[in-house]
UniProtKB/Swiss-Prot annotation:
<dbReference type="Pfam" id="PF22594">
    <property type="entry name" value="GTP-eEF1A_C"/>
</dbReference>
<dbReference type="InterPro" id="IPR009001">
    <property type="entry name" value="Transl_elong_EF1A/Init_IF2_C"/>
</dbReference>
<feature type="region of interest" description="G2">
    <location>
        <begin position="86"/>
        <end position="90"/>
    </location>
</feature>
<dbReference type="GO" id="GO:0004781">
    <property type="term" value="F:sulfate adenylyltransferase (ATP) activity"/>
</dbReference>
<dbReference type="GO" id="GO:0005524">
    <property type="term" value="F:ATP binding"/>
</dbReference>
<dbReference type="GO" id="GO:0003924">
    <property type="term" value="F:GTPase activity"/>
</dbReference>
<comment type="similarity">
    <text>Belongs to the TRAFAC class translation factor GTPase superfamily. Classic translation factor GTPase family. CysN/NodQ subfamily.</text>
</comment>
<keyword id="KW-0547">Nucleotide-binding</keyword>
<keyword id="KW-0548">Nucleotidyltransferase</keyword>
<dbReference type="InterPro" id="IPR050100">
    <property type="entry name" value="TRAFAC_GTPase_members"/>
</dbReference>
<comment type="function">
    <text>With CysD forms the ATP sulfurylase (ATPS) that catalyzes the adenylation of sulfate producing adenosine 5'-phosphosulfate (APS) and diphosphate, the first enzymatic step in sulfur assimilation pathway. APS synthesis involves the formation of a high-energy phosphoric-sulfuric acid anhydride bond driven by GTP hydrolysis by CysN coupled to ATP hydrolysis by CysD.</text>
</comment>
<feature type="binding site">
    <location>
        <begin position="107"/>
        <end position="111"/>
    </location>
    <ligand>
        <name>GTP</name>
    </ligand>
</feature>
<feature type="region of interest" description="G3">
    <location>
        <begin position="107"/>
        <end position="110"/>
    </location>
</feature>
<dbReference type="GO" id="GO:0070814">
    <property type="term" value="P:hydrogen sulfide biosynthetic process"/>
</dbReference>
<dbReference type="InterPro" id="IPR027417">
    <property type="entry name" value="P-loop_NTPase"/>
</dbReference>
<keyword id="KW-0808">Transferase</keyword>
<feature type="binding site">
    <location>
        <begin position="28"/>
        <end position="35"/>
    </location>
    <ligand>
        <name>GTP</name>
    </ligand>
</feature>
Length: 473
């Protein structure tokens, strides 16, 4: 490799590193064209290689629905059952980039029975593309996916009114769907950013290239919008949140605390507070795998060395010295239930919250949400794919934020005690004891430890519901 090639390669790497990343998902009713849209994006941005095109043409003849044409939906419908049925079942992730930005796409399922898959895809995305069939207008699944997207903290919605070619590109149909969605959106979060784009994913109109068949539409193409939109981070850049994930002690002369800086900034010499111990200390060093830093920014993986010798554990938080954040032991959360086993009040689970594993107890199911009508329904249980609001009790005081304020420190996953399978995803609505005044109860602590022992070594006794309802009712 000559010097010019090395220089060009270095410039290319520098350019790639400077590109911002946008994570978005596509969702909507079955057969609205989600997979076709992603296939069109990849095809028209030259992201499909010649050998992939060759196999795609072959697969299109066997599984495709477009006659002799390439079925672009097969680019992302990877499972055999998906290709045979013509639907998306699993969340399919695809990566591509343009000269302006890098993208991660999540193609989520449209069927109601795959709500948990859709929630999984939405949990890490910044933007949601809601596909609407121009012939059918808004559907119950459109309402459901809009709500789930906003429930998972997504503030940017693109309503992609697809298959405009099948309604003769009529502006009236586009405007009516737009009007209906704006009326519905009043039931969602107040701070949403919504844009409407008429398109045809099959023909590639208003996806990457502007069409001349809809002169009444003066907006940009889908790709142009994705390349230029600026996502406002809901996480405050001032509120320091550094959960300790690992105690780094390679030898007797070094003790550091490793983790990811989730929000705020940190610099050498900064005075911080450690929660839940509520102890102050000063940052003496910030170390990475290959160098030392004077300061650290959001998203950096670092090891922090403190001036004082303090007993710090995994899951403890470093926050600003003037932070009002306090440990809490009770909270109200929204939950997406992801297993066939029914969720009932009085049951207990492990949860992972900001890297810390802790026991929680379901004190009360406040209501179940009908995601098609957004009505609150009184319920004593949650079944697979249900979304509800519950009151939980942590076995120990923990640190967290409301999910609406910080997605990183306000989310948790529920883990079954016996199988260690993930059974639910929770988003914290608020704390019920902001001041951290946790009542001490040694009897409950003993019974909780005794319960741990029994469920670990004698699972066949089948006692979780009986014991924990008595202890934490």
């Amino acid at each position: 490799m000559n010097i010019n090639m090395k220089d060009n390669f270095k410039k290319w790497l520098d350019l790639q590193q400077k590109k911002t990343l946008l994570k978005f998902l596509t969702c909507g009713s079955v057969d609205d064209g989600k997979s076709t849209l992603i296939g069109r994006l990849l095809h028209d941005t030259k992201q499909i290689y010649d050998d992939q095109l060759f196999f795609l043409k072959s697969d299109s003849k066997r599984h495709g629905t477009q006659g002799n044409e390439i079925d672009l939906a097969l680019v992302v419908d990877g499972l055999q059952s998906e290709r045979e049925q013509g639907i998306t079942i699993d969340v399919a992730y695809r990566y591509f980039s343009t000269n302006k930005r890098k993208f991660i796409i999540a193609d989520t399922p449209g069927h109601e029975q795959y709500t948990r898959n859709m929630a999984t895809g939405a949990s890490t995305c910044d933007l949601s593309i809601l596909l609407v069939d121009a012939r059918k207008g808004l559907s119950e699944q459109t309402y459901r996916h809009s709500f789930i997207s906003t429930l998972l903290g997504i503030k940017y919605l693109i309503v992609a009114i697809n298959k405009m070619d099948l309604v003769n590109y009529k502006q009236e149909i586009f405007e009516n769907i737009k009007k209906d969605f704006l009326i519905f959106s009043k039931k969602l979060a107040n701070d949403l950013n919504i844009i409407f784009i008429p398109m045809s994913a099959l023909l590639g109109e208003n996806i990457v290239f502007k069409t001349k068949l809809m002169p009444w539409y003066q907006g940009v193409t889908l790709l142009s919008f994705l390349e230029t939109i600026k996502i406002k981070n809901s996480i405050s850049s001032e509120e320091l949140r550094f959960p300790v994930q690992y105690i780094n002690r390679p030898n007797a002369d070094f003790r550091g605390y490793s983790g990811i800086l989730l929000s705020g900034r940190m610099h050498v010499g900064q005075t911080i507070k450690i929660l839940p111990e509520n102890i102050n200390s000063r940052v003496s060093r910030i170390v990475t795998f290959d160098k030392e830093l004077k300061k650290a920014e959001i998203g950096e993986s670092i090891t922090v060395v403190l001036k004082d010798e303090i007993d710090i554990n995994r899951g403890d938080f470093f926050v600003n010295i003037d932070s009002i954040l306090q440990p809490s032991q009770e909270a109200i959360i929204d939950i997406v239930w992801m297993t066939d086993n029914i969720l009932l009040a009085g049951e207990s689970y492990n949860v992972k919250l900001s890297g810390k594993k802790i026991r929680v107890y379901i004190k009360e199911i406040l209501f179940k949400l009908d995601v098609n009508t957004l009505k609150k329904v009184k319920s004593h249980s949650l079944v697979l794919n249900s979304i509800g609001r519950v009151k939980i009790y942590f076995s120990k005081p923990v640190i967290f934020d409301n999910y609406s304020e910080n997605r990183m420190t306000g989310n948790m996953i529920f883990i079954d005690l016996l199988t260690n399978i993930t059974v639910g995803a929770g988003m914290i609505v608020n704390s019920l004891d902001k001041k951290g005044k946790i009542p001490s109860n040694k009897q409950k602590d003993f019974e909780s430890d005794f319960y741990d022992l029994i469920t670990r070594h004698f699972p066949h006794w089948n006692i979780p519901k009986i014991l924990m309802k008595k202890v934490y009712k």
